[in-house]
Amino acid sequence: MEANKIIITGGATRIGAAIAKKLSGPNKEILIHYNKSKSKAESLKKELEINGTKVYLVKADLSKETDVNKMVKFAKSKLKYFDCLVNNASLFENDKLDNFTTDSWGKHLRTNLRTPALLSKEFAKNI
């Protein structure tokens, strides 16, 4: 099975951008999530649209459930359904024992664990 409607979290840079490039092509629709990399997301969008890919960009802080819900709603409005979810986004800060806080730990857990689970649950509803 080949995916045609794809969501990639953390898709604007590094591995996410490489995945978007690999999965792009005519008759493909890709929703690229970004948080702080707006200019890179816009540049990638232009690049992918040259080869016939329809690209949607969505900004969201994946540590915030309200942003995750808005992203899912946006994805459904644009893609109608999706047949591939790439949970690529992650939060990686250089926390050490001397600057570690429960707030930063919570943000890591929400971004790196809870959100992929919530998005996977939404994906399961679409297949």
Predicted regions, residues:
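A short, exposed helix-loop element centered on a Lys and neighboring polar residues
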Residues: S120-K121
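Substrate-binding pocket helix/loop in short-chain dehydrogenase/reductase
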Residues: K96-L97, S104-L109
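Conserved glycine-rich Rossmann-like NAD(P)H-binding loop of the short-chain dehydrogenase/reductase
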Residues: K28-E42
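The beta1-alpha1 cofactor-binding region of Rossmann-like NAD(H)/NADP(H)-dependent oxidoreductases
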Residues: K38, K59-M71, T102
